[in-house]
A protein has these predicted regions:
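Short beta-strand to alpha-helix junction loop
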Residues: 32-34, 59-63
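A conserved helix-loop-beta module that forms one wall/lid of the active-site cleft
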Residues: 46-61
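Active-site core segments that coordinate phosphate-bearing ligands/cofactors
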Residues: 1-18, 24, 29-40, 44-47, ...
Length: 172
């Protein structure tokens, strides 16, 4: 058995290979940023065997190849390399070209998210924000994504429309 995030599971179903990334491990709180390794202290505290952690691959690197079963079911070419995976907010920041300290991605959908990149290992001691290894984080170059999530942003837009803009009146 291995601990897998959704992207790890999808890649495993495509390739048959089980692996993960530092970014993925950090989203699962399994990464020790100060020592640049799996958070053994957390694994030990909860009694998790370290063998549950999958092999770690770079975020941008070959992480497997599409196998015959997946290729046949999905109409993909067998052997196509799987070369990237990350969580939703790191992916959003990537799509908006947010890579460097001080750069911010902000989106509003079901939730409202502000995601900024930091170049230092630090954290919020009150846990008001989440910190992940950003897609371009390496041991040599710290790039941490700091995420503030405001749940209910999308439903707020609906509430405003129903309660402030009567039927027949557009936002324009």
């Amino acid at each position: 058995y291995k601990i897998m995030l959704p992207g790890d599971y999808i890649a495993m179903k495509l390739s048959g290979d089980i692996c993960t990334t530092v970014s993925g491990l950090s989203e699962g709180m399994f990464w020790d940023f100060k020592n640049n390794r799996v958070a053994d202290f957390l694994m030990d505290y909860y009694g998790f065997d370290s063998s549950l952690i999958a092999d770690i691959k770079p975020t941008f690197a070959e992480q497997g190849r599409v196998n015959a079963v997946a290729a046949n079911e999905l109409g993909l070419k067998e052997g196509t390399p799987i070369t990237y995976r990350a969580g939703d907010q790191p992916n959003n920041a990537l799509s908006l070209n947010v890579f460097n300290p001080g750069e911010i991605a902000s989106t509003a959908g079901t939730s409202g998210v502000v995601y900024g990149v930091n170049g230092e290992v630090n954290y919020d001691p009150q846990s008001r924000v989440n910190t992940f290894a950003h897609v371009n984080h390496t041991m040599e170059q710290t790039r941490l994504g700091v995420l503030l999530c405001i749940n209910g942003t999308g439903i707020l837009n609906s509430w405003v429309k129903r309660n402030i803009a009567p039927e027949g009146i557009s936002y324009n």
